[in-house]
């Protein structure tokens, strides 16, 4: 193995969170790419599908205290393990159409909660990057309710306000 500071092995963490049920992860690697799935907080992803294939929307939830405590603990484990992290928050991990909350304001609310909590600010020393994510299939900004150019501009602006400038 050739030493390559700042590069090396990447670990992908498929991190599924739900109201009252966000696990603590303990990953390592030079870079831990965290896909943080918050679909269980979104009516567009936590509903039910009838036998005829009709989707019935669920309920939108704010991100809860356990979410923040346990994601922080997971980030802290990465710091302890000498890892850097890259993050994408998303409402979908399976390629589902329209996984977002009922309103775009709720998407913006989730971003504002992350900012107000200081989650990214407190770990900016180990953050390699934060993807805008959130909307569309896999958080890739296609196949969703809020993937028009206008919504993307609002999303980028909200994320620029949320993510520490140093990142």
Question: Positions of the model-derived regions?
Answer:
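N-terminal substrate-binding region of glycoside hydrolase catalytic domains
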Residues: 1-71, 94-96
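Acidic (Asp/Glu)-rich catalytic clusters
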Residues: 20-28, 73-82, 117-124, 159
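Structural preference for beta-strand elements that scaffold enzyme active sites
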Residues: 31-33, 82-86, 127-131, 167
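Alpha-helix N-cap and loop-to-helix initiation/capping positions
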Residues: 59-66, 99-110, 146-151
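Extracytoplasmic/secreted envelope proteins and their assembly/folding machinery
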Residues: 68, 72-75, 108-111, 115, ...
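N-terminal/domain-start segments enriched in small and hydrophobic, helix-friendly residues
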Residues: 71-94, 98-105, 121
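Active-site groove signature of glycoside hydrolases
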Residues: 86-97, 114-149
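Active-site neighborhood of glycoside hydrolase catalytic domains
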Residues: 111-113, 147-167
